[in-house]
Amino acid sequence: MFEKLHVVCPNCQITNRIASEHLTSEPNCGSCHQPLFNASSFNLDEASFDKHVSRNEIPVLVDFWAPWCGPCHQMAPAFEHAASQLEPDFRLAKVDTQAVHSLAERFNIRSIPTLALFQGGREVARQTGAMSAPDIVRWVQAQALARNLG
């Protein structure tokens, strides 16, 4: 019997229960009927951040960035490419620290870009500085292996 996982919809923020064997079969949200995974990241505000980090039973990788940050803009395409490789085993999201400065303060973000990996509502790993897509994928997979995530 397969495990049922809670996966928060990036469109309507409703928590869905998905059998683990169906994660790779392009599941749709039971509420809004949009795809739960679309091989790209999505933006979070404070309320959606808390839902995704606390309710998703798959690890959530968050890119803390700012619009004025050159390295953040350089890393953005790499983060999107990493999303296409890491979903559905990981959920990738972005937080604009200028628009949602309360989250930057809450997580003591002092340098951007900063990647933070969350599992079970808590931060389990952090990496600061721009990275290429292969480096992001390797880092996430190494963190998952070291911490037995996912």
Question: Where does each model-flagged region fall?
Answer:
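A short beta-strand-turn-helix
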Residues: 41-60
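Non-catalytic, surface beta->alpha helical segment in thiol-disulfide oxidoreductase systems
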Residues: 111, 116-149
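Short Cys/His-rich micro-motifs in 6-15 aa windows
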Residues: 32-41
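Typically the conserved alpha-helix immediately C-terminal to a functionally engaged Cys/Sec
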Residues: 71-86
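Short linker/helix segments within small regulatory modules
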Residues: 18-27
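Cys/His-rich microdomains that often coordinate metals
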Residues: 16, 36, 76
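Short cysteine-rich clusters marking metal-coordination/redox-active sites
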Residues: 9-12, 29-32
